[in-house]
Amino acid sequence: MLGWTLVFLVVAVIAGLFGFTGIAGAAAGIAKIIFFLFIVLLVISLLINALKGKSPRL
């Protein structure tokens, strides 16, 4: 999921460099949404593992 965020971020940067501000804005917005979704899922996963008493896998 974090990989998709990076893909949309790269698309936004390239589109911004070429002057496609609409595409750049949309791609940056999508990247931001996916990034925050990733953070929320990470926190939920950490909380569930902490409540179950499992130690994190390294």
Curated annotation (Swiss-Prot):
GO terms for cellular component: plasma membrane. It is a multi-pass membrane protein. Coiled coil: none annotated. It holds the Pfam family DUF1328. The chain crosses the membrane at residues 6-26, 28-48. Keywords: Cell membrane, Membrane, Transmembrane, Transmembrane helix. It is found in: Cell membrane. Belongs to the UPF0391 family. NCBIfam families: PRK13682.1-3, PRK13682.1-4. This is UPF0391 membrane protein Shew185_1413.
